[in-house]
């Protein structure tokens, strides 16, 4: 019974490790939306806490819900361009390709997700190359072994043939004189 308990515990260990790895990967993959509010302050992200960000904005030409960002938000977006949400008086980011997050600060690990066809072709080619290298390696190792076996087999045949044939001495003449 003790052995059965150990086996069931050992088989659940890989399952638990896989579950933990899945949770870690899921945490890294989940992307935040492009929010412009800080969760700690729940307010606007200004340089000074006392500064009124909405009061310092300059009204530029308005195109729908968004306008150009004020100069104080020039470097707000890390890998993208800034736009200002007029209704909320907050900055927002439009991230470059391959970046995600509120300020485009994270690299999107699944950026090349749409190129599955190319990834599949590359994987198939890699598997075929590995298979060819494996076959060449096996053939290279087996060929000398086969030669050695053939040589040993020939030597053994020569020995057995030599033992089966009784040597005839030509110097001695056979006579039927009894």
UniProtKB/Swiss-Prot annotation:
**Subunit description:** Monomer. Interacts with EGFR and ERBB4.
Q: Which cysteines are joined by disulfide bonds?
A: 69-82, 77-93, 95-104
Gene Ontology BP, a term: positive regulation of fibroblast proliferation
Q: What does this protein do?
A: Growth factor that binds to EGFR, ERBB4 and other EGF receptor family members. Potent mitogen for retinal pigment epithelial cells and vascular smooth muscle cells.
Q: What does the entry state regarding organ or tissue expression?
A: Synthesized in several tissues and tumor cells. Predominantly expressed in pancreas and small intestine.
Residue numbers covered by the propeptide annotation in the UniProt entry: 112-178
Domain of life the protein comes from = Eukaryota
Q: Which gene encodes it?
A: BTC
Q: Which InterPro entries match?
A: EGF-like_dom
State any single GO MF term: transmembrane receptor protein tyrosine kinase activator activity
SUPFAM superfamilies for the chain: EGF/Laminin (SSF57196)
* Endpoints of the signal sequence: 1-31
Query: Keywords, A to Z?
Result: Cell membrane, Disulfide bond, EGF-like domain, Glycoprotein, Growth factor, Membrane, Mitogen, Secreted, Signal, Transmembrane, Transmembrane helix
Which residue ranges are assigned to the Cytoplasmic compartment in the record's topology?
Answer: 140-178
Q: Name one GO cellular component term.
A: clathrin-coated endocytic vesicle membrane
Q: Pull the Extracellular topological domain ranges from the record.
A: 32-118
Q: What is this protein called?
A: Probetacellulin
Positions of the EGF-like domain: 65-105
């Amino acid at each position: 019974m003790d052995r059965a308990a150990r086996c069931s515990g050992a088989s659940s260990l890989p399952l638990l490790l896989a579950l933990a790895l899945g949770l870690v990967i899921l945490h890294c993959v989940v992307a935040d939306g492009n929010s412009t509010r800080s969760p700690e302050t729940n307010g606007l992200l200004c340089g000074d806490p006392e500064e009124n960000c909405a009061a310092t904005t300059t009204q530029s030409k308005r195109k729908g819900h968004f306008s150009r960002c004020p100069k104080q938000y020039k470097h707000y977006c890390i890998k993208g361009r800034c736009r200002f949400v007029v209704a909320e008086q907050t900055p927002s980011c439009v991230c470059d390709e391959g970046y995600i997050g509120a300020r485009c600060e994270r690299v999107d690990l699944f950026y090349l997700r749409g190129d599955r066809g190319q990834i599949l072709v590359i994987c198939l080619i890699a598997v075929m190359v590995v298979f060819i290298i494996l076959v060449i390696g096996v053939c290279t190792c087996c060929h000398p072994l086969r030669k050695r076996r053939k040589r040993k087999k020939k030597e053994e045949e020569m020995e057995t043939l030599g033992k089966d044939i009784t040597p005839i001495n030509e110097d001695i003449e056979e006579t039927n004189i009894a």
